[in-house]
């Protein structure tokens, strides 16, 4: 009879321990109930990107001197710069400039090392297409400034997203 009593006591202790673990999990669940949601409703709400966000590259054709520094500092030699040497003035004339965003890793080296500041990073991050050949932007497409998230009246911007504590 003595082993049966100890087994019953062990069973009771295990039951109490299991109830305590369930209670701890339930308390954690309840503590998260009064927090704000971390996710946003993406197409209808957008986060305002930070100042240093590295989005699509903007190119100013008039400022470019075709020095090809952007090509040399790019880890994957991505920008394609076509130029012609003007012999009478002994300067390069830019003919075509293009970047394939399907290959670009958005490192920002081209923007950082450009001597004339003709390249800049924008806040545009919606570059998805059904055809990857549409991601090859020429100087005309690179010259378009994106519509600012703040100016877009069709979406609601989320300014204060709660910080995630780890």
Curated annotation (Swiss-Prot):
Molecular-function annotations in GO: 4 iron, 4 sulfur cluster binding; iron ion binding; NADH dehydrogenase (ubiquinone) activity; quinone binding
Membrane topology classification: Peripheral membrane protein
Any one cellular-component term (Gene Ontology): chloroplast thylakoid membrane
SUPFAM superfamilies tied to this protein: 4Fe-4S ferredoxins
Keywords: 4Fe-4S, Chloroplast, Iron, Iron-sulfur, Membrane, Metal-binding, NAD, NADP, Plastid, Plastoquinone, Quinone, Repeat, Thylakoid, Translocase
Co-factor binding details: Binds 2 [4Fe-4S] clusters per subunit.
InterPro entries registered for this protein in UniProt: 4Fe4S_Fe-S-bd, 4Fe4S_Fe_S_CS, NADH_quinone_OxRdtase_chainI, NDHI
Cell compartment(s), UniProt: Plastid, Chloroplast thylakoid membrane
Catalyzed reactions: a plastoquinone + NADH + (n+1) H(+)(in) = a plastoquinol + NAD(+) + n H(+)(out); a plastoquinone + NADPH + (n+1) H(+)(in) = a plastoquinol + NADP(+) + n H(+)(out)
Cofactor or coenzyme needed: [4Fe-4S] cluster
Binding locations of [4Fe-4S] cluster 2: 74, 104, 107, 110
Pfam families: Fer4_9
PROSITE patterns: 4FE4S_FER_1 (PS00198), 4FE4S_FER_2 (PS51379)
Residue stretches making up the 4Fe-4S ferredoxin-type domain: 55-84, 95-124
Swiss-Prot/TrEMBL GO biological process terms: photosynthesis, light reaction
Residues binding [4Fe-4S] cluster 1, per UniProt: 64, 67, 70, 114
Family the UniProt entry places it in: Belongs to the complex I 23 kDa subunit family.
HAMAP family tied to this protein: NDH1_NuoI (MF_01351)
Name the UniProt record assigns to this protein: NAD(P)H-quinone oxidoreductase subunit I, chloroplastic
